[in-house]
Amino acid sequence: MANIIKVIGREIMDSRGNPTVEAEVHLEGGFIGMAAAPSGASTGSREALELRDGDKARYLGKGVLKAVAAVNGPIAEALKGKDALAQAELDQIMIDLDGTENKAKFGANAILAVSLAVAKAAADAKHVPLYAHIADLNGTPGVYSMPLPMMNIINGGEHADNSVDIQEFMIQPVGAKTFREGLRMGAEVFHSLAKVLKADGHSTAVGDEGGFAPNLASNEAALAAIKVAVANAGYELGKDITLAMDCAASEFYDKEANIYDLKGEGKKFTSEEFNFFLQGLTERYPIVSIEDGLDESDWDGFAHQTKLMGDKIQLVGDDLFVTNTKILKRGIDNGIANSILIKFNQIGTLTETLAAIKMAKDAGFTVVISHRSGETEDSTIADLAVGTAAGQIKTGSLSRSDRVAKYNQLLRIEEALGSKAPYNGLKEVKGQG
């Protein structure tokens, strides 16, 4: 038994200067777990609710004192005396206590912070690393892998104040033999890209996720700049480095007109036309993964996209699936996409997150563990990626300590596990292995 004696919630700051919830869980014997909830900018409409205070006189309405009060009040009372090793039971207690479909009473930010803190406290009580405890909870004890990183080196959309409509342009160091080598390759391309952008007279200011946020003539111009940067860094595009995109297409979808409006380059597309636009990019560049290539509700369009490209590249559902097993099952049953992005604050507990990962893997989908644009120094997703052998991780660029914290944790884990956690590179990407 690792009984909970105290649960503490507090309001802390995230990487965008907005409040978020941090929770501490204290166990008998002095064991402690602490975790913070992240926050998204481009959010799916079906995500679990992030509870904000709405008091415009305080943090412009974005305070989280209501969520913190839920942690310090009803959640703390309900969990006191319970065994922290019983993760699923404790998560269910919080879900039932909240009593809403989308965790609107307490907020997914409150429930998730406690859920993750429980797991960390339990790992502490077991005297094992968090990734090892997560593997136990996942039913795969001792099974690990180092994730292939998707490094977001050009930011657009809701993550930057620029003319680029597509939200993320990412590189994947598929030619590396280890995570450490892959991280180095990514960093070298990132610095090479800074020189390319400067030489063309572009800004090298960074967006929410640490990537550069230049004003470019088109979305394809971002891919062209990265292509030059990869070559200048001494790598071969398509062999050493592959490309990935997160369109976050819901953000530029005009629901009334039923069109995809790339305002930055003055182009408009129907659903089918946008699929062909994306297909064209994959033919000109080694893009092996596209996330949220259409609006979250455009299921007919996604069916077409999957038929068009699903046997060649990875099609990732983020806003589409929101880490929700009910929605994911519908996608699996209807042949929609072939991969899922996992963001634990979209669903609100570690147990539900693990269930989504299992369902995806059982269906032959690939899994990408992801940060949010509003992050903290909390590096739990690094342990989640290794402990579930997810295979891929998205945690931003090679700048901003809120992003680099996750990479540094992965370096530590790889050092500790060595050959027990293989780095499989391109084999992890759907359609490429």
Swiss-Prot record:
The lineage of its organism: Bacteria, Pseudomonadati, Pseudomonadota, Gammaproteobacteria, Alteromonadales. PROSITE patterns: ENOLASE. One of its GO terms (cellular component) is cell surface. It holds the Pfam family Enolase_N. It is found in: Cytoplasm; Secreted; Cell surface. It comes from the Bacteria. Pathway: Carbohydrate degradation; glycolysis; pyruvate from D-glyceraldehyde 3-phosphate: step 4/5. PANTHER family: ENOLASE (PTHR11902:SF1). This is Enolase. It catalyses: (2R)-2-phosphoglycerate = phosphoenolpyruvate + H2O. GO terms for biological process: glycolytic process. Belongs to the enolase family. The active site is at residues 209, 343. Keywords: Cytoplasm, Glycolysis, Lyase, Magnesium, Metal-binding, Secreted. Its EC number is 4.2.1.11. (2R)-2-phosphoglycerate binds at residues 167, 343, 372-373, 394.
